[in-house]
Amino acid sequence: MKQELSLLENQLSYYRSQADYYSRLSRSNGTANFGISGRSQINIVAVRTVSGSMGELVYEGIIMTVHLELREGEGRLLINTEPKIGIDLQTSANTAILVAEELTNQSLKTTDVILTVIADSETEILDGPSAGAALTVALLAAINDETADPSILMTGTINPDGSIGKVGGLIEKALASARFDAKEFLVPYEQSVAVVYKTEETHPAPGLTIITTKPELIDIEDYIRDEGYELDIIEVNNIVEVYDSVILEE
């Protein structure tokens, strides 16, 4: 758990510095003279820690809803949460704005982007950057006046070139998606498999018990099926693939 938390912290630091740089660069070069109006909604999947049956901390997937609004303004990014949610969306949202501007050839420097994140309870989220792909889809949908399919969920960071970056907590996110009755779960390329740690107990002698933990590579879709759910796990490389998969046809 410490290793994965360290990885998530490093991701946060990296994407914060990266997005801040590109955000300043992009907004200084915009050309639009008036703002854009639009709305969209998308569900995001994240991971939080909860207390296990023995009092230990364990990971748990959580589904939250993001309402996105574009309105004429000053190029601000405004993030609200209901109720209080500890999540860093600022970095991934800034990168999402850059990618959306590039793909649509629209400047958002005179448009305010307002995100409202709704969860079922107060919580601390570990991996805000993994919502980057979903936020980019929401932005594109609002600009294009299109609708994202609520039965398709996703996880993945968004890079300035539009590629989808790898994330952690795939098992927990996939299980939460399945329980949400999603039909598809989009994951970064080569992340349809994950490592789980299985505990084995042996008794080599009377009164002696040896417990070992071994890593095992599993197919996430098979794991979800073994848990009693059906969920298609689909690998994606870039935001264009994601958008084409998610947007509902008129």
Predicted regions span which residues?
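Peripheral, non-AAA+ core regions of ATP-driven protein-machinery
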Residues: 1-250
